[in-house]
Swiss-Prot record:
Repeat among keywords: yes
Name this polypeptide is given: Pleckstrin homology domain-containing family A member 1
Superkingdom classification of source: Eukaryota
GO terms under biological process: androgen metabolic process; B cell receptor signaling pathway; cellular response to hydrogen peroxide; establishment of protein localization; estrogen metabolic process; face morphogenesis; Leydig cell differentiation; luteinization
Keyword Cell inner membrane belongs to the record: no
UniProt free text on domains: Binds to membranes enriched in PtdIns3,4P2 via the C-terminal PH domain.
Amino acid sequence: MPYVDRQNRICGFLDIEENENSGKFLRRYFILDTREDSFVWYMDNPQNLPSGSSRVGAIKLTYISKVSDATKLRPKAEFCFVMNAGMRKYFLQANDQQDLVEWVNVLNKAIKITVPKQSDSQPNSDNLSRHGECGKKQVSYRTDIVGGVPIITPTQKEEVNECGESIDRNNLKRSQSHLPYFTPKPPQDSAVIKAGYCVKQGAVMKNWKRRYFQLDENTIGYFKSELEKEPLRVIPLKEVHKVQECKQSDIMMRDNLFEIVTTSRTFYVQADSPEEMHSWIKAVSGAIVAQRGPGRSASSEHPPGPSESKHAFRPTNAATATSHSTASRSNSLVSTFTMEKRGFYESLAKVKPGNFKVQTVSPREPASKVTEQALLRPQSKNGPQEKDCDLVDLDDASLPVSDV
């Protein structure tokens, strides 16, 4: 289906019989440009072709006299129509019936507009900028589509009117941002590191347009063409985080694709070849490193400060204090255990045989707890005694003897 691109040209794919009467139709990409008064075709979309690829064929619209349906002339070719251009007939084949009708209509409309008509007393819409009344300003408008938004800018035509009088000098004043395409670019303050054409994806419409990129020491910008003075956009290198080969190139169906990642947006740019892609990545990365310096990218290591050393010694001091307290507590427990042991044996010496009672351990209490309770339990000076116990005979041989 024919569609209108950003330059207001009608584009689309058709099959054309390039060799007359051969009956062989080849797939080509057609562009109908009424401003250039031409109908040209390429092997593929020029955006997908390498830079400098030439067109396959072209016809001036002024040479086309009529465009009509040719299904009866070529019954074997479906949806066929014919263009009568001079001494030759060009047969083309559309995709379907609706595609055929639309191409025939737009071509007939184009040749009606572009063919000059001397008998017309009133200028048509296409020639309003060329013909005007004597003594009046001739104002034309230029439409640019930037980021999917149409921008209409009034411009002045540098020409002489039909009455032979030169246009007023006020008409020759131009805005500095809207100079003609043939104006050469002035010398830049920063040296240009790399420049060339690449294909870029739009931010809003997500379509791909061929732009002229230019990299200098501080920025990377892209222009509509190499003859433009003002760039469509300038990206400061300080906002660029990284430049790398795009990992989504297979998803986007684009070869030689790399991405420029910034703070607000990721720019997808397609180069003409893998070598050109790597050259752009290397050039932009080198410019970023040269601007920021290698010191910023390297991570600096700081030695530990006095506060860190102070904290580092705290665990050692705490461990030392803990060990001292544990040792003192162990010595205290050993002393207590020794004293209690002596008291225990002294009490046994005063107890009658058969009256000695052993402490029972509860199944719910651990042995360590019972031992600690036994050690810490205060005892009388003479040891535990019962009320009904008799006097102990110290000469009894059955009494236990302790070596104290």
